[in-house]
Amino acid sequence: MINKSKIVADLKLDLSDTNLSEPFNVLVDSLNNEANLSFAGKLAAKYQIKQHLRNRHLISQIYEGIEQPKVSQPIFVIGLPRSGTTFLFNLLSQDSNHRSPLFWEMMKPFPLVETNGYKEKLRIGQSNLILFFKERFIPQLDDLHAIKSDSPEECLLIKVFALQSILYFYMANTPTYLDYLSNCDTRIAYNQHFKFLSILERQQKPQRWLLKDPSHLGNLDEILNYYPDARFIHIIRDPVETIPSICSLTAQVRKGFSSNIDLHDIGKRTINFWEQSNKKNESQRLKLSSKEYMQVQYKDLIDDPINLMKDIYANFDFYLDEKTLNEMTGYIKKGSLEEKVKHKY
């Protein structure tokens, strides 16, 4: 069992903070009662929860010292999981005007360290150790979703600071927690998200933040509550192609933490969750203009990515220079030359 009382005592948590107590209790109860975690899975889940809560505490402490925080304009890349968001995100990352939180920054963010300095290299090394153990738990994950310590990663690794992240459902069978995620007040997660970016900006303020997480899909109102000037790029791909892929990925991840994998249950709950997210998105996006919210087709991204980049920049009135275009073209060429493992399921 994951001992809630011991975690509370070890971290000196204040569970009178209802923004923390509800997700904490729902998550741990779901892991204990439903997940059927292996011994190693319990250790991993407990470690992650404690790390996420430590970072949450540090965020609260540091944020108190920031006067009138304001975050640079963010671009959110959204869409169903496995719909091409990573390729689109990585293309946009070639623009030096864009900054995205790096994996190591979300794993070992505090205290802030000097860019390219010795302490940053030490943090990257610590994050590489996390990835080493991740590879031991989930050997095939890099073939399906490669992660590097010094590369941008998804916002689900920021939302964990609020204990409101679909990451936990990917890790383990947590149906009660997934139901909570579908119906909870996600402003709690975006409050942590905003605080985290505000802190990162103290060291390096970008022209624009570039952010990605499929679970942003049904949270446009909550995002705009903290980022009123946000822009959204929504990539559309047939769910018949995307949903089976994320179900397969979920099953692969869970094998590292449990020996009891119910593929039918994963499929049913995955469809229900993303159907609800999509319905929320359909109503919320009606409030936004085409200059704030742009839908793009997966086929266009694959067939002619550079032309799509030009369309995106023109739509949002962003300047696209030759240097950035060349970087994007180079990224595409490099990707086409690299041997990729096909996701079979």
Where are the regions that the model predicts?
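Post-Walker A helix-loop "phosphate-sensing" segment adjacent to the P-loop in P-loop NTPases
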Residues: 94-104
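PAPS-dependent sulfotransferase catalytic core
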Residues: 244-276, 325-345
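Conserved phosphate-donor/acceptor-positioning beta-strand/loop module used by diverse small-molecule
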Residues: 212, 223-248
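Long amphipathic N-terminal alpha/beta scaffold segment
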Residues: 40-80
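PAPS-dependent sulfation machinery
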Residues: 107-209
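Glycine-rich phosphate-binding P-loop
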Residues: 77-94
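Phosphate-binding beta-loop-alpha motif at adenosine-nucleotide cofactor sites
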Residues: 207-214, 230, 268, 288-311, ...
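Charged, amphipathic alpha-helical linker segments immediately N-terminal to NTP-binding catalytic cores
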Residues: 13-56
